[in-house]
Amino acid sequence: MAETHAVLDALRAPLDAGLELDNTPGAFLASIFLVRCARNLAAVLLLCETGWAPEAQTLLRAMVEDMVTLSYISTDPEQLPLKWLRFENRRLPDAEQLLAAFSGQKMPEREDQPKYERWTRLSFNGMAKRAEKVVPGILEYLRYVYPILSDRAHGNTSASSMYMRVYPDGTVEPLYLPSGAQSEITLCNAVTVTYTTAERVKALGVTVDLGPIELAEQRIYDACGLPLELPEELAD
């Protein structure tokens, strides 16, 4: 888990030093996702260290969603950040207030009940498909991990082996105590998602040193004995 701590330290470094970013909506939006990624990674790491990896996978699912969303947004850094900030998220007027403060513009008037509008008509898979041109392989990765993580989030029966163990004699053991099961694979995926998110954050104009994150990603996969790329039979 030392490698994951190294990733978290690298992710926090620009936050500790004070964010440096371009004066654009894309960079502003990316900085929000960077903070969220750092917080979620810290929470996933804490849960895995204390034996709650299946629960950490619910947070990992949120990290995957953010990775896909930001990757899609980065395909059109001029328009999509504004759509994200001004449409669906008008339910949160603080977003536009933060943007105004960041860019030195006049503070917008708050609306008591801002109108809800979708910022994109694309499905989640549709966003991932569009993001392929900036993050090759993101759609296949999403198809590989997202159903598993959704099982954890929604408690589907296919995830029941994480909560109950049935023995040949009919004995049922409730698995309610912490254990180290699935910690390594959870952290491996969390680091991969973090690297991709950080790379997109940098592409949108936020200063992030990707070197330590990339190195830690390789080390954690080596330590787990896992390939960094999807096996060919899963990538087809």
Stretches found by the model and what they are:
Residues M1-D236:
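A cross-kingdom marker of C-terminal helix-rich interaction/assembly modules
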